[in-house]
Amino acid sequence: MTYNPFSLSGKTVLITGAASGIGRATAIECCRMGAEVIITDINPDGLEETFRQLPEQNGTHIRIVADLTKEEEIESLADRLPRLDGCVNNAGIMKLVLTPFLTTEIIERIQKINLIAPMMLTRNLIKKKKMKNPSSIVFTASAGGVFRVSAGNGIYATTKCGIDAFMRTTALELGGK
């Protein structure tokens, strides 16, 4: 047997926002590294396409359609999950809106999925003891939110800075456990 420090063999990983983009790529790569994955997204067609692309050699993969902007769906998702070795909080949206055109509706929509959803999912996973010890919780932030700014990117950048701060705080709180 060859030692592979990047192996996820025997691990179970939840990936949110898995219907496309970074979430889809993460799910496929986790499978290639040996993990069984649980993928979730609000988009059933995209989720099904991701599911079809998953390598089958690692056992049973699960797909769950969920709207993570709704707290009751986050709680239901957490209840359905087995104990996890990892969670990739990836679900998110980007919408460029110049400051004079921001509305409360736009701000709340982006905040709900980019900031509140990963915070509430993480809280539920911890409270319901769904994370194994040791385990990993990953958050998708953005250089566009943390290191540089661009016109129309104010609310997106704000949510990504917020999730970066939440990640650091959560790591501090849970790191010694």
Task: Go through each PLM region and give its residues.
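Conserved NAD(P)H cofactor-binding loop of Rossmann-fold oxidoreductase domains
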Residues: A91-L96
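Active-site loop of short-chain dehydrogenase/reductase
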Residues: K11, R83-L84, K128-A143, G176-K177
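Catalytic loop of short-chain dehydrogenase/reductase
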Residues: V138-G162, M167-R168, L172-G175
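Conserved glycine-rich cofactor-binding loop
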Residues: A19-S20
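Substrate-binding pocket helix/loop in short-chain dehydrogenase/reductase
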Residues: L98-Q111
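A short, exposed helix-loop element centered on a Lys and neighboring polar residues
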Residues: T122-R123, R168
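Flexible N-terminal pre-Rossmann segment of NAD(P)-dependent oxidoreductases
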Residues: M1-K11
